[in-house]
């Protein structure tokens, strides 16, 4: 069947290898993207050959099904960057967002210090408008290049894109994010701030276990983690999944968790908080076996 594709495709690739949860069955088809030109070829093909597909980066915000995915998984590994001016940098979407923040802050550039503790790709950060309480991706963003559903490369300035808390226009109108350009400022204190941010995250978050980061978006003016803590749910365990004792908004894989374990814990949290009149909305992407 892979012979029918005009590009190389693998079959039955375990998605647990591409998830920070370390959970997930095999992808029916799997394609690693390593250049924008390759991505253009793939999306042009998909425009005329409908096939269920998903795009993943580092899998840091995904929960795959134990059965895997019955379609094509596109793994974005398109990396690279270039300075367009002294304080503007264009970054390809498969690049590590955390490493980008670390490198730039160590070189005396401010604007993306918050990225040091966010374990996804640049494309994923734009898609989710990833951030912290201090800043988010859209703050420093000045341009995005995308490949639209018909396989055409487009350049979109920031002012034409509407972002909000953990929300981008690409969540409602899917497109492949090819690159992002950021505006930086020179600041010798940037490295110090980045170091403090990562130290705080290590102290407060369960990095020693596989997880997908924060499971829920924070309700306006509230902390989802604190709400879960006050509800007495920290430490609750089902199968190999557990609500972290370190941070209530993290569900961790203690070693042998399956998708059902994680979903059951998510449901328990939502139902418990709903009884208190609080609706928690998932930040993690739940990717089913079939779309």
Swiss-Prot record:
Record's keyword terms, sorted: Cell cycle, Cell division, Cell shape, Cell wall biogenesis/degradation, Cytoplasm, FAD, Flavoprotein, NADP, Oxidoreductase, Peptidoglycan synthesis
Active site residues per record: 166, 214, 283
FAD-binding PCMH-type domain ranges (all copies): 22-187
Alphabetized PROSITE patterns for the sequence: FAD_PCMH
Cellular component GO terms, alphabetical: cytosol
GO terms under biological process: cell division; cell wall organization; peptidoglycan biosynthetic process; regulation of cell shape
EC number(s) stated in the UniProt entry for this protein: 1.3.1.98
Cofactor: FAD
Pfam families: FAD_binding_4, MurB_C
Localisation per UniProt entry: Cytoplasm
Pathway(s) of this molecule: Cell wall biogenesis; peptidoglycan biosynthesis
Catalytic reaction equation(s): UDP-N-acetyl-alpha-D-muramate + NADP(+) = UDP-N-acetyl-3-O-(1-carboxyvinyl)-alpha-D-glucosamine + NADPH + H(+)
Principal location class: cytoplasm
Span of the signal peptide: none
Enzyme class: oxidoreductase
Recorded family membership: Belongs to the MurB family.
Function: Cell wall formation.
This protein's name: UDP-N-acetylenolpyruvoylglucosamine reductase
Name of encoding gene: murB
């Amino acid at each position: 069947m892979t012979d029918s594709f005009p590009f190389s495709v693998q079959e039955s690739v375990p998605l647990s290898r591409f998830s920070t949860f370390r959970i997930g069955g095999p992808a029916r088809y799997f394609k690693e993207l390593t250049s924008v030109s390759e991505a253009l070829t793939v999306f042009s093909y998909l425009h005329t050959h409908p096939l269920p597909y998903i795009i993943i980066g580092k899998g840091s915000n995904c929960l795959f099904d134990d059965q895997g995915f019955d379609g094509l998984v596109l793994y974005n590994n398109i990396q690279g960057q270039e300075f367009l001016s002294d304080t503007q940098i264009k970054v390809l979407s498969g690049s590590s967002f955390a490493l980008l923040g670390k490198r730039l802050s160590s070189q005396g550039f401010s604007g993306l210090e918050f990225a040091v503790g966010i374990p996804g790709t640049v494309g994923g950060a734009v898609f989710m408008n990833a951030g912290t309480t201090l800043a988010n991706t859209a703050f420093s963003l000045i341009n995005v290049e995308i490949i639209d559903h018909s396989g055409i490369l487009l350049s979109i300035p920031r002012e034409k894109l509407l972002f909000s808390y953990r929300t981008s226009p690409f969540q409602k109108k899917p497109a492949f994010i090819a690159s992002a350009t950021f505006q930086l400022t020179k600041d010798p204190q940037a490295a110090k701030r980045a170091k403090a941010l990562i130290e705080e995250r290590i102290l407060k978050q369960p990095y020693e276990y596989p997880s997908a980061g924060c499971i829920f978006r924070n309700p306006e003016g509230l902390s989802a983690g604190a709400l879960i803590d006050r509800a007495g749910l920290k430490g609750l365990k089902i199968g190999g999944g557990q609500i972290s004792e370190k941070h209530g908004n993290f569900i961790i894989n203690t070693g042998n968790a399956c998708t059902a374990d994680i979903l059951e814990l998510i449901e328990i949290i939502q139902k418990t908080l709903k009884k208190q009149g609080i609706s928690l909305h998932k930040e993690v992407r739940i990717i089913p076996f079939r779309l």
